[in-house]
Regions:
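FAD-binding subdomain of flavoenzyme oxidoreductases
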Residues: 1-150
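C-terminal substrate-recognition/cap domain of FAD-linked oxidoreductases
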Residues: 114, 120, 125, 133-302
Length: 302
């Protein structure tokens, strides 16, 4: 661990929980949590360009890679430790997303960070899906960079967050090791309210820097628990004859409304033909200034 540069040399085969266990005694964390966190490795994250829990800004593992070491059929390919370089093509970009085609990633120097102690969280409801994604756009384009900016459509908010099923839910969360997060959260909440979002002031959760996480109560906490359980529920539902899966993409804001409408029409029709009906829901996994990354879930009886 290089505490001064905030970087660590980590072997590619380490599983997510073990990686965090090794960094914790030093007071650091990688802070990259894909949904497969428990059963996937650092090397796997890098060669698949894994998306993590940050919904804005540092959304993918790319942002944490300082240098890589890969064993290839032609020998060892190792890049230099540099904070950045403008000297031609980046060798790390060859490794990121290579999916094992070039060789086996054995280790990497990763950018790490101090464990966050300041947290702030809010969950706002909207009368429509459209109002919810307009709020998400306003927040991300203000460049406040919340760690969490998840939008759930009414179906997903109803099944995973315990809402009535006729409201969209926007989850906003900030975290920092050094700076209280009340100001950025209140600015994000203000923007979301202006777009039609609803939340009582007492439901806005802000920690005092004691390392106590917030946002585990109410609809926000219910969705978080559902998100963690989701990968394990598929085996159970498959045994009950339920056909279900997920798919995701990204698209620019100007094309998003018509794209979403077309996807929903096509999937609803397919579920009706194949399963006699079913459910389709959507949430934003990551949100960029120029567009969202929607994640669709569907299920029906086989």
């Amino acid at each position: 661990v290089d505490a001064t540069s905030r970087a660590a040399r980590i072997q590619g085969g380490v599983l997510g929980p073990h990686l965090e266990d090794q960094l914790r005694p030093h007071g650091f964390t990688l802070r990259h949590y894909p949904q497969s966190f428990e059963w996937s490795t650092l090397g796997g994250w890098i060669v698949t360009r894994s998306g993590g829990h940050y919904a804005t800004n540092h959304t993918h593992i790319d942002d944490f890679v300082e240098s890589t070491r890969m064993v290839t059929p032609k020998g060892i390919m190792e890049s230099r430790r540099l904070p950045g370089s403008g000297a031609g093509p980046s060798p790390d970009r060859l490794v990121l997303g290579s999916e094992g085609a070039l060789g086996i990633l054995t280790e990497a120097w990763m950018r790490i960070q101090a464990r966050p102690g300041f947290h702030a969280s809010a969950g706002l409801t909207f009368d429509s899906w459209q109002a919810g994604y307009e709020a998400a756009r306003q927040v991300v384009q203000a460049k406040l960079w919340p760690a969490n900016l998840r939008l759930l459509d009414p179906t997903e908010a109803g099944s995973a967050a315990g809402l009535k099923g006729d409201e969209a839910l926007l989850i906003i969360g900030f975290e920092s090791a050094e700076i209280p997060q009340d100001w950025p959260l209140r600015q994000a909440v203000r923007l979301a309210r202006e777009a039609g979002g609803r939340i009582e002031d007492e439901a806005i959760r802000i920690s005092d820097g004691s390392d106590e996480e917030v946002g585990r109560q109410g609809a926000v906490g219910a969705w978080r628990n559902s998100f963690v359980r989701a990968p394990y529920q598929r085996n159970l539902t498959a045994g009950m004859g339920v056909v279900g899966d997920t798919f995701e993409t990204s698209i620019t804001w100007d094309r998003w409304p018509s794209f979403d409408a077309n996807v929903r029409a096509a999937m609803t029709g397919a579920l009706q033909r194949v399963c006699g009906g079913g459910t389709l829901s959507c949430r934003f996994t990551h949100v960029y200034t120029d567009g969202p990354a929607p994640y669709y879930s569907f299920s029906g009886m086989g």
